[in-house]
Amino acid sequence: MKIVAIGIGQCGCNIADQFYAINDYSKSFFGRRIEILTDAFAVNTDDTDLSSLKYIPRDMSHRIVIGATRTSGHGVGKVNYEGATIMKESLPVIIDDVLNSRNFYACDAVMVIASGAGGTGSGGIGPLVSALRERVGKPVYAIVVLPFGYEELRETSYAVVNTATCLKTVNQVADAVFVLDNERFGRGSVSLARNLEVVNQQMVRNFFDLFCAGEEGRQKFVGSTVVDAGDIKQSLESISTIGRGEATLPIFHRWKKNHYKESSNGAISLVGALSQAINNLCLNVGAEDARTILALLCAPQDIINLNAVTEISNHLQQRAPKAEIRIADYPRRAREISITLVLSTLTSVGRTENIYLKATELLNKRKALIEEVDSSIKRVEELCAGIPILV
């Protein structure tokens, strides 16, 4: 599956930059010689954030500054309404750049990425996704990044209200929304910059095998059950999440694969990778909450046998008896085993439900706070009513 990646705001642009980086690796001689990205764009109201990107081309068709006359290139200050207004004004320019990009006709979907907590990304992603769905004639998916826990603690937290507004809007206009929770991958002892870098890399890495599997051209790496853009499209709807789990075979597995002790190791390793994939989901949900599940098994051909696939299928059926389950394989060499797991049409997401509840409470508190501030200002004005001014 080939995509066009569009990042909005600082967070979204950084993730789009990582998609560009992993595509460069994928195309290389030392990678898989597969192209999974036709192009990538970074859209922001802050030109300084755009200058920090490493991989997306530096021309103005790929790094797009919007709202320069309103913000002077310094962002919208977390005001998502301002971000939405600027995005609506800039839609013709952005969409023309996307449609005129190299090999756009070859892409299977468009992925729009933003943080829910910011201003430009949170406000801009809804209008852009809606406009793209009307124009491009391809599935338009969204990635929305949830804020860190510390951003939600303040009684006047813009992060909570912005995220709730963003999620509600995007869920109504996108074909599917991947929700990434920063809290799932954050490490307290590591710098904030490193935390953000790890989260971005992990998110993009989760999609790597999934996108490569349907574009593989070498016969020995083509699976018996191939997952392509059509399968992904049918598997995705509404709120979704993705995770990846890994296991490693013994060094001498290739020479011992006929040994009786090795007969069950493959299935055991795959089940272990599946458990890790569930634990590594970008959102804290269980498989039982999904109505659609897609599992991609990546391993040497001798490991992906009928017994192993049956074991994985039974394991998923037990965890999610009501879900429609698709299982595909992607033969790889070397000793690495991995499983990419996509859960979609999630019926219960505690994290987002809590954000909606907090946002409602904060909006009510904000109204009372505004009234209190207005009352205080009026009282001060009354106190100084008899004092002259020198203007």
Regions flagged by a language model, labelled:
Residues M1-V391:
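Tubulin/FtsZ superfamily GTPase core signature
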